[in-house]
Amino acid sequence: MSVSRKIIYNVTASSISKVITTVIALVNIGLITRYLGQEMFGNYVVALAFFLLFTALGDFGIYQTTTREISRPGAKEDEIVNNAIGLRITISLAVIAISPIFIWLSSYSNELKIALGIVLFAFFFASFTQLLIGLFQKRLLMDRVALVEMFGKVLQLALVAIGVKMDLGFNFIVGTLLVTMFFNFIVIFWLAKKFVRFKPSFDIAYWKKFLYQSFPIGLSVFVSFIYFKADSIILSWLKPSADVGLYGAAYKMIENLSFFPGMIVGLTMPIISYNIFSNRKKFETIVNKN
């Protein structure tokens, strides 16, 4: 199959999966909003915002840089990926070690503080899943990732439905995110073992060169978080949870529908990286088509 056809296939498969996932997510949000009510849904929105904050803090551009580097001609894939994993472990553990201090010093309710602890561990699994996705992007196998994410959403919906039916409470609903992220990580890791022999590396000299390239990307990710999601956290400091819930319900609708541009860029980035130096004409063609 030609590269163009592979891209079209991946975009089509990912789009179909994402449409199904979006429908599931909207049903999920509907169940959660009705079950929790406006005030507790506000706490749920805050918990999700902190999940994205932890993700932004621990990003450092590692995923994007890894995907770019392994996609270049003659790349030492095992070395790049294993050093990226070692770096991700170090940064993620630092975020997990430091964040609880700020959580417990905050003025949030104890129930919400527990929820923030849950999403902190969800971030840990999500960050590694994101890193491994680069291996599939390089090989234009994002249909597999899309399928795993779709089943993850189905699992979360089933757990939320059980939680609502049995009245298991707010933190059980938040916990479904942790279970989903763990499920996604386990399956993606199992699939990725076919591509790389995983053995985390802690080469400080390599990390310095890597971070020199990745940190500006990580900074842009954090700025994007501030632009798109920091408003929910700031609102939770200024207004009651009920107001945050009202704002968050409307915002979730937009969030679930604005995925196509980022998906297309993600699918084509490995090919762009491969051709930027080796085949300039093809590189320009792909960029123009994007």
What are these regions (language model features)?
Residues N10-I20, D78-E79, F121, F136-A161, ...:
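Alpha-helical transmembrane segments of multi-pass membrane transporters/permeases
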Residues R5-Y63, I96, P100, G152-K153, ...:
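Signature of the first transmembrane helix
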Residues Y9-T21, A47, A56-I103, I114-A115, ...:
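Membrane-water interface segments that mark the loop-to-transmembrane alpha-helix transition
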Residues M1-V3, I7, D143, N171, ...:
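Interhelical loop/hinge segments that connect adjacent transmembrane helices in multipass membrane
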Residues I29, G58-A75, Q137-K138, I254, ...:
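Helix-loop junctions and terminal segments of transmembrane helices
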Residues S4, E69-R72, F125-V148, N171:
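Membrane-interface junctions at transmembrane-helix termini in multi-pass inner-membrane proteins
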Residues L53, L57, I89, L93, ...:
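Alpha-helical transmembrane segments of multi-pass membrane proteins
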Residues G117, V148-K194, I254:
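Hydrophobic alpha-helical transmembrane segments
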